[in-house]
């Protein structure tokens, strides 16, 4: 075979493809005339040496052409490989060299064969060349040889004749065959040279002809139509699949499929379900049918359809069949590397060649010229094999081939002729490799061939083996027809060619299944074919792991011994599974079906892996943690070991391919059984023991719940069975029949036997009858017991129905449906809370913005801000300063009073007021926010409480289950169910008076309520109605109560809303409940004695419930008759005990409810008190509003009397001087009185103390300040209350001087006051503010005189407003009667001492003494003074008569921060939140003193220490005597008398202090800093000692005289601007830094 194919066979084999594909007849015609040329070929071949020298160059060209042509050759290679060249794939190269041997003689072929495939290497240099490629391209391939010789012809003309002869069929010398040769050349134009250009298109077409290559490397999609897709959809999906698929892959990876599926826009959960359905192979990748299913499901999901849980059977079958088709047609990944890249695509051409060779053998025999082409075809196939080995040994064969070519040169001429004529030698080489070797040794035969043509005959004779080789080549016989040697060669050719060709075809057929066999796709566990490269090292591992017969320990494998570069798939191959099963069976000697851990350790440790790896492998193999491995799990473990030994890592989780089918099926079965059990486990209500019955019915009801096999029931038995008739008759018939049936006269022994049997049967029947009678007796007894039990139950039910509290027992708690409804409503309301809170916050923001806008509108100023949002810029300030300077100069020129200081401070005033108002608004908004947050928290906590009460507990669930069982007959026997229904019917048919009588006491009469409580529970009954009748209303009322409490704590009232909804306040519940409720709540101790005979359970006492105060004895007699109504005493059954337990539980509930009612009552009382306090505040607010209106009217009247007011100023100045002189002596006496009073003061608070809490109980200030005057007095006693600028919580209530000092003060200044003058003076002082009523700007007025006059009057009021009025402040100071000014006194209505008007005048007169407005900026507006109507201030009543203190404080709060005379918005806001400004702040006091009511008779200014505005922080703690008799911080409660109390107070800050005429000492404390306050510090009645007082500026001598002169003249006074009046509202006003 080798020799034949290698040398001479090249051309014949090459001719075979030609004959197959292109026709043999023309070639035969060419060959016959060319036979002579073959003889001449040796001469041409004599130059092969040169030809060889030339061939390398031609070979390089041919190589270049071969490389692209190799693809075409691949299709032709397999036949050669299968014919025997598979073992020697390079034979093709040798065959190429066959051309050389062909030329040189058989011996040359022997030489080439000797090289052993060195000729393979050599021939590529010569014929390894393109002949392969050219022949492949032509599949005539012939001209490859022709063309190469043609290339060689230029070098050797004789050699040219050889090629043409070699072309054999296209020789150039023969003119007649030249045309066919040209045709062959054109066919062979596929080869390298110019003539091959027209043939290149076949080259490209042939690679495509190798269509199998596109199937392997491309995408293989069967032409199968999927029924669930339309044709367009399937085509579109196929195109999309091909585009997304990487080259060389058949399945779309998970990542790429995910990217495509994500384009659908479906959620990941839906895509996950679609992936689980589409990935039928569980490989993590999608073949085309799976991809089509995924796209189909995505389309359905996009349309809105739901993704099914499972695919339909139709889709499953179509997809699985298509997946199988793809799997069978895709070559196994392991088999690809086994063959060269050219081997696979040659499959189809090989088949074609084989088929053609098989079908045309006869034709080949007829036409040897075609056989000549066959020789070319065989040359074809070797050349193809050369191309296979070509990349590896292309150049080397050329180099080594030079040697044989030289040998051919030695005797080339005749051997070439003999070779050309005698193809038989070439055939003889094909017969086997051994002859080739012998040829190699024999160089002498080569010489004999060279001697002459005789050797040709010898070749023929020696060609007997060659004839055997050439038996397969029938065409050679045709060629040899003209030549006897050729005929012999051809005859010998036939059989060998046939034998050679047959294995080729069959061998190639065997390779096809190898390519298609890898049907095992991922997931097919244990059914994967063995990879083509085998399982390296598996036998070694098997030998190592098998148990040793000797029992000696086996040496462990080295860890890396089995590691190779082998490909080991995840799935277990069949052969591998068999090996693992063998190892398993060898170790499982007990045939237990499993290997325990110890045995597994012995096996696995022999693999050489470390312990950690083996642990991981065991964990993966034993997922259920059984501690042993069955056969499949053992195979998994071994496969993992094998993979790891081959270099693969151990996975973290078992891939789907390795999950054993047994475990899958078992887990599925277990899950299915569990689902069955779960589905049937929840069914209750029917008893499965149907033999139990109270009726005695012996018939057993058949149903599907219970099945019991009856062994005696055999079903149908055929009568035709032998032996069965007699036994059946004997058992069913009579004895006579038995005898007759026994047949033919039974013997006596048989009759005796029958008698004994019948006797036994009779005895059994008797025993059965006795048992039945015994059973009937037992059943009858049970029936009687059941009947008795029924009667007892009926009696108990009757007693329950008759009992007044039957509603409680029948309706214990709300039903589950009602609870669920309440829970839903509660959740719904809770969900609305955030939205409501958000709306309230938004409204709060709007309110704050509106307040700021209102402030800007009501407080116009010359200092207009030009910045964003009306902000004042530096340019605005500069302009205001320049304007103020200009006014000062004008005043100096005109001789008017200077207003430079006030104008200069105008911008600071406005900014301070704006800042104050802004902070106030922000604080108010923050407070509201906090209140809203508190409400939210309270509602949430209330919701949690209610939900916890409504939520069912485990006990309630169990109780409800028992209740439903015994009341609704759920889950009981049929008889019991009927009995329960009968009880229910009797209960409903019984008249209702009993229930009415039971419900009546629950709601009303005390005569029945008490007996019921004593009889049933021994406790009070008020909870009965709430527990059983209307629990829903109770829960609602409780929720309302809690909400009202929390809102009341925040100062919000919701009582009207609650009443509007029909819910009575919690405190009204005890009154509305039965009259017996209150006595029972008051004293369960009295009610319990009557209950003790029936139920001896002191549950209420033991649970720690406090015994109520008293019980109504009238109800006790009524309780005794009801005792017998309770459970009968003679019943000692468990029912009584259960009943007692229920009643005890009821008593506990009632006790808890009583406690709750008591707490609710207390809270309601507190709420009422708070409500009263709030109403009082509202009343005061209304009064203040009326007072403001009165003042406004008085001011309007006073405008018409401005001239008279100017004249009155002189009188006021005189009055001020008189008051000033009186004041000089008054302080000297007042301190002595104060000093004398401390001992009395210490005793007087004790009797007044009891009345203080009652008076202050409704005061929200006391509640916010931890309630009561004690808390208010504590800071004062500690010396910390003297700072009015601290937080309101620390010093809110301000202590007032003792009544003794107040009584003395009016006596010292009994000077009468003209009310008209005072009114006019006040009107002038308030001119600036009252002008605001017309929404004008006082600064815009041109009347400078009025401006100065108002300003001077305001300045005087600020300087001297606190000279005498501090005495009048005591009644509302809220402090007890004590000499200590820091103590708190009970509130009293404001008194009107006669000194107050004079003091006011003095203050006005003293205001003229201020050197200038710069040292004393204007005070806050006067109309904002908290002044009650004149009717409320006739005199100061006793401390015990004092009404609540707060009314005075809120009034000041409302009015002080309102620019207009009446500001209802601020009044209301401050009334709601009036707990932030301390009562004794100097701001309030100065306001209160500076503006007494105008419309009232001449009462003095209010004496109450008014609270500061809500949002305005108090001034700094530097003025201890600002109208409130507080000592400065750090002074003990009874401070020593100030030595200089006889003198009027000096002006504050830089303003010079005034010495009283007569050298009176200076007043105690100075006022706030001048930039903030223009008013001097008011004198404190109990001022500190001189050492404790802050320093004062030096007094200016003569200041009083100058000031009084100005006041008398009235020319330098000017109207005070509204900004100046409110200067004290600034949070930094009056701050004194210690």
From Swiss-Prot:
Which segments show compositional bias classed as Acidic residues? 1130-1139, 1331-1345
Q: Which residues form the EH domain?
A: 233-322, 576-665
**Looking at the record's lineage, which domain of life comes first?**
Eukaryota
| Alphabetical list of InterPro entries matching this protein | DUF1720 (IPR013182), EF-hand-dom_pair (IPR011992), EF_hand_dom (IPR002048), EH_dom (IPR000261)
Q: Which CDD domains match?
A: EH
Annotated spans, Disordered: 1-215, 330-471, 492-522, 711-744, 946-965, 985-1634
Stretches with biased composition (Low complexity): 28-42, 55-74, 110-180, 335-359, 368-386, 723-737, 985-1028, 1071-1129, 1211-1255, 1265-1284, 1293-1304, 1371-1386, 1397-1413, 1424-1442, 1520-1529
Q: Where is the composition biased (Basic and acidic residues)?
A: 1029-1045, 1140-1203, 1614-1623
Compartments, as annotated in UniProt:
Cell membrane; Endosome membrane; Cytoplasm, Cytoskeleton, Actin patch
- The coiled-coil segments of this chain are 748-803, 831-859, 1131-1198
Q: A GO molecular-function term, please?
A: actin binding
Q: Which residues form the WH2 domain?
A: 1599-1616
Question: Which BP terms from GO are recorded?
Answer: endocytosis; endosomal transport
Query: Where is composition skewed (Gly residues) in this entry?
Result: 1-11
Q: How does it sit in the membrane?
A: Peripheral membrane protein
Q: Which residues form the EF-hand domain?
A: 266-301, 609-644
Primary location = membrane
Q: Which UniProt keywords apply?
A: Actin-binding, Cell membrane, Coiled coil, Cytoplasm, Cytoskeleton, Endocytosis, Endosome, Membrane, Repeat
Any Gene Ontology CC annotation: plasma membrane
Compositionally biased intervals (Polar residues): 75-93, 387-471, 492-513
Function of this protein?
Answer: Component of the PAN1 actin cytoskeleton-regulatory complex required for the internalization of endosomes during actin-coupled endocytosis. The complex links the site of endocytosis to the cell membrane-associated actin cytoskeleton. Mediates uptake of external molecules and vacuolar degradation of plasma membrane proteins. Plays a role in the proper organization of the cell membrane-associated actin cytoskeleton and promotes its destabilization.
Q: Which family does it belong to?
A: Belongs to the PAN1 family.
Q: Describe the protein's quaternary organization and the partners it interacts with.
A: Component of the PAN1 actin cytoskeleton-regulatory complex.
Name of this chain's protein: Actin cytoskeleton-regulatory complex protein PAN1
The gene that this protein is the product of is PAN1
């Amino acid at each position: 075979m080798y020799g034949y194919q290698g040398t001479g066979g090249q051309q014949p084999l090459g001719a075979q493809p030609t004959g197959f594909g292109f026709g043999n007849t023309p070639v035969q015609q060419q060959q016959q005339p060319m036979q002579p040329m073959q003889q001449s070929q040796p001469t041409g071949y004599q130059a092969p040496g040169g030809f060889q020298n030339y061939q390398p160059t031609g070979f390089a060209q041919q190589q270049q052409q071969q490389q692209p042509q190799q693809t075409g050759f691949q299709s032709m290679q397999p036949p050669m490989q299968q014919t025997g060249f598979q073992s020697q794939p390079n034979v093709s190269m040798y065959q190429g060299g066959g051309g050389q041997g062909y030329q040189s003689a058989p011996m040359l072929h022997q030489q080439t064969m000797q090289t052993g495939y060195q000729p393979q290497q050599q021939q590529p240099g010569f014929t390894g060349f393109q002949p392969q490629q050219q022949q492949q391209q032509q599949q005539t391939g012939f001209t490859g040889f022709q063309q190469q010789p043609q290339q060689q012809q230029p070098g050797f003309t004789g050699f040219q004749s050889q090629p043409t002869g070699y072309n054999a069929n296209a020789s150039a010398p023969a003119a007649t065959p030249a045309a066919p040769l040209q045709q062959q050349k054109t066919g062979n134009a596929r080869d390298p040279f110019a003539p091959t250009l027209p043939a290149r298109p076949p080259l490209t077409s042939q690679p495509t002809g190798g269509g199998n290559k596109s199937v392997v490397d491309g995408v293989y999609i069967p032409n199968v139509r999927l029924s669930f897709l339309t044709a367009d959809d399937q085509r579109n999906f196929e195109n999309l699949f091909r585009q997304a698929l990487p080259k060389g892959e058949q399945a779309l990876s998970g990542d790429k499929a995910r990217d495509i599926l994500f384009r659908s826009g479906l959620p990941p959960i839906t895509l996950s379900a679609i992936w689980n359905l589409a990935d039928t192979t569980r490989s993590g990748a999608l073949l085309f049918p799976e991809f089509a299913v995924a796209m189909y499901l995505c389309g359905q999901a996009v349309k809105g359809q739901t993704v099914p849980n499972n695919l339909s059977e139709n889709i499953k079958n179509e997809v699985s069949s298509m997946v199988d088709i793809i799997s069978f047609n895709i070559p196994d990944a392991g088999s690809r590397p086994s063959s060269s890249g050219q081997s696979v695509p040659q499959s189809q051409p090989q088949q074609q060649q084989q088929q053609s060779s098989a079908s045309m053998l006869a034709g080949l025999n007829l036409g040897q010229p075609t056989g000549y082409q066959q020789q070319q075809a065989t040359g074809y196939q070797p050349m193809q094999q050369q191309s296979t080995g070509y990349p590896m040994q292309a150049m080397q064969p050329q180099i080594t081939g030079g040697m044989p070519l030289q040998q051919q040169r030695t005797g080339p001429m005749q051997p070439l002729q003999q070779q050309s004529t005698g193809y038989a030698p070439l055939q003889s080489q094909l017969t086997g490799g051994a002859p080739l070797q012998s040829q190699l040794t024999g160089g002498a035969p080569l010489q004999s061939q060279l001697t002459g043509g005789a050797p040709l005959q010898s070749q023929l004779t020696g060609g007997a083996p060659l004839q055997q080789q050439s038996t397969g080549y029938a065409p050679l016989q045709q060629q040899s027809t003209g030549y006897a040697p050729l005929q012999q060669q051809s005859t010998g050719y036939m059989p060998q060619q046939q034998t050679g060709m047959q294995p080729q075809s069959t061998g190639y057929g065997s390779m096809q299944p190898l390519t298609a066999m890898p049907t095992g796709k991922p997931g097919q566990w244990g059914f994967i074919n063995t990879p083509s490269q085998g399982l390296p090292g598996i036998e070694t591992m098997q030998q190592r792991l098998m148990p040793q017969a000797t029992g000696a320990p086996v040496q462990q494998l080295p860890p890396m011994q089995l590691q190779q570069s082998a490909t080991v798939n995840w799935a277990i191959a069949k052969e591998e599974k068999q090996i693992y099963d063998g190892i398993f069976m060898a170790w499982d000697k007990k045939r237990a079906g499993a290997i325990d851990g110890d045995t597994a350790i012995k096996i696995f440790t022999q693999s050489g892996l470390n312990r950690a790896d083996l642990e991981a492998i065991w964990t993966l193999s034993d997922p259920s943690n059984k501690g042993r491995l069955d056969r499949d799990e053992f195979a998994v473990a071994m496969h993992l070991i094998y993979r790891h030994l081959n270099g693969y890592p151990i996975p973290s989780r078992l891939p789907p391919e390795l999950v054993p089918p047994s475990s899958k099926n078992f887990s599925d079965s277990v899950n299915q059984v569990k689902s069955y059990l779960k589905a049937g486990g929840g069914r209750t209500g029917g008893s499965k023991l149907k033999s139990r019955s109270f009726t005695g019915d012996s018939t057993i009801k058949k149903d599907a719940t219970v099945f019991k096999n009856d062994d005696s029931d055999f079903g149908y038995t055929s009568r035709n069975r032998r032996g069965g008739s007699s036994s059946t008759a004997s058992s069913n018939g009579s004895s006579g029949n038995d005898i007759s049936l026994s047949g033919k006269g039974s013997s006596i022994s048989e009759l005796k036997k029958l008698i004994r049997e019948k006797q036994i049967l009779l005895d059994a029947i008797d025993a059965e009858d006795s048992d039945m009678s015994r059973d009937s007796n037992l059943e009858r007894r049970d029936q009687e017991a059941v009947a008795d039990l029924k009667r007892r139950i009926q009696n108990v039910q009757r007693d329950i129905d008759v009992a007044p509290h039957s509603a409680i027992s029948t309706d214990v708690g709300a039903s589950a449906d009602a609870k669920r409804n309440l829970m839903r409503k509660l959740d719904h309301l809770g969900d609305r809370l955030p939205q409501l809170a958000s709306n309230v916050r938004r409204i709060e923001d709007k309110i704050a913005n509106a307040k700021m806008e209102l402030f800007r509108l009501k407080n116009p100023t010359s200092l207009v801000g030009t910045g964003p949002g009306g902000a004042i810029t530096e340019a605005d300030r500069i302009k205001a300063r320049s304007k103020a300077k200009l006014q000062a100069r004008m005043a100096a020129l005109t001789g008017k009073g200077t207003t430079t200081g006030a104008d200069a401070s105008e911008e600071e005033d406005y900014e301070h007021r704006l800042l104050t108002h802004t902070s106030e608004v922000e604080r108010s908004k923050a407070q509201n926010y906090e209140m809203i947050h508190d409400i939210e928290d309270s509602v949430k906590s209330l919701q949690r409480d209610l939900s916890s009460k409504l939520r069912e507990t485990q006990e309630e669930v169990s109780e409800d289950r028992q209740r439903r069982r015994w009341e609704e007959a759920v889950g009981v026997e049929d008889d019991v169910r009927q009995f329960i229904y009968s009880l229910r019917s009797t209960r409903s048919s019984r008249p209702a008076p009993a229930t009415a009588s039971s419900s009546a006491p629950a709601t009303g009469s005390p005569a029945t309520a008490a007996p019921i409580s004593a009889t049933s529970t021994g406790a009070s009954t008020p909870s009965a109605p709430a527990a059983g009748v209307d629990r829903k209303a109770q829960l609602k009322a409780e929720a309302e109560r809690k909400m009202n409490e929390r809102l009341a704590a925040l100062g919000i009232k919701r009582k009207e809303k609650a009443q509007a909804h029909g819910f009575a306040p919690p405190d009204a519940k005890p009154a509305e409940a039965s009259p017996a409720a209150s006595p029972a709540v008051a004293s369960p101790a009295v009610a319990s004695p009557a209950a003790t005979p029936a139920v001896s359970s002191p549950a209420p006492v033991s649970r720690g419930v406090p015994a109520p105060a008293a019980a109504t004895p009238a109800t006790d007699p009524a309780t005794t008759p009801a005792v017998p109504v309770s459970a009968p005493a003679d019943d000692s059954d468990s029912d009584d005990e259960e009943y007692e337990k229920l009643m005890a539980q009821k008593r506990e509930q009632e006790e808890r409810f009583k406690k709750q009612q008591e707490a609710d009552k207390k809270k309601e009382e507190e709420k009422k008190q708070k409500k009263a306090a709030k109403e009082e505040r509202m009343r005061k607010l209304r009064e203040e509003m009326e007072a403001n209106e009165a003042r406004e009217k008085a001011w309007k009247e006073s405008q018409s009397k401005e001239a008279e007011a100017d004249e009155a100023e002189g009188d006021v100045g005189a009055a001020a001087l008189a008051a000033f002189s009186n004041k000089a002596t008054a302080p000297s006496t007042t301190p002595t009185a104060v000093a004398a009073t401390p001992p009395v003061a210490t005793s007087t608070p004790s009797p007044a103390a009891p009345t203080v809490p009652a008076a202050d109980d409704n005061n929200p200030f006391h509640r916010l300040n931890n309630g009561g005057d004690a808390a208010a007095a504590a800071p004062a006693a500690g010396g910390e209350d003297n700072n009015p600028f601290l937080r309101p919580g620390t010093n809110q209530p301000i202590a007032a001087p003792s009544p003794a000092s107040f009584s003395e003060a009016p006596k010292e200044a009994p000077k009468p006051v003209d009310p008209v003058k005072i009114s006019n003076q006040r009107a002038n002082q308030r001119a600036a503010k009252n002008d605001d009523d017309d929404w004008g700007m006082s600064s815009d007025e041109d009347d400078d005189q009025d401006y100065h006059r108002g300003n001077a009057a305001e300045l005087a009021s600020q300087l001297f407003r606190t000279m005498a009025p501090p005495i009048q402040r005591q009644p509302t100071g809220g402090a007890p009667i004590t000499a200590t000014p820091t103590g708190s006194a009970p509130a009293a209505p404001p008194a009107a001492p006669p000194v107050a008007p004079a003091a006011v005048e003095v203050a006005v007169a003293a205001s003229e003494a201020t050197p200038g407005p710069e040292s004393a900026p204007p005070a806050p507006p006067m109309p904002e003074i908290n002044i009650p109507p004149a009717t409320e201030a006739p005199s100061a009543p006793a401390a015990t008569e004092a009404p609540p203190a707060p009314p005075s404080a809120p009034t000041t709060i409302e009015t002080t921060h309102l620019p207009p005379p009446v500001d209802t918005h601020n009044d209301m806001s401050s009334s709601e939140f009036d707990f932030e400004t301390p009562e004794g702040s100097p701001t309030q006091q100065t306001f209160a003193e500076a503006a007494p009511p105008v419309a009232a008779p001449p009462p003095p200014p209010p004496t109450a220490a008014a609270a500061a505005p809500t949002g305005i922080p108090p001034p700094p703690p530097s003025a201890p005597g600002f109208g409130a008799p507080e000592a400065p911080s750090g002074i003990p409660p009874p401070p020593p008398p100030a030595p200089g109390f006889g003198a009027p107070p000096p002006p504050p800050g830089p303003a010079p202090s005034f010495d009283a005429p007569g050298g009176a000492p200076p007043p105690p404390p100075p006022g706030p800093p001048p930039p903030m306050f223009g008013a001097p510090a008011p004198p404190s009645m109990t001022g500190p000692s001189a050492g404790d007082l802050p320093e004062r500026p030096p007094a200016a001598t003569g200041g009083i005289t100058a000031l009084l002169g100005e006041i008398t003249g009235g020319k330098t006074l000017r109207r005070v601007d509204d900004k100046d009046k409110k200067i004290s509202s600034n949070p930094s006003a009056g701050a004194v830094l210690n």
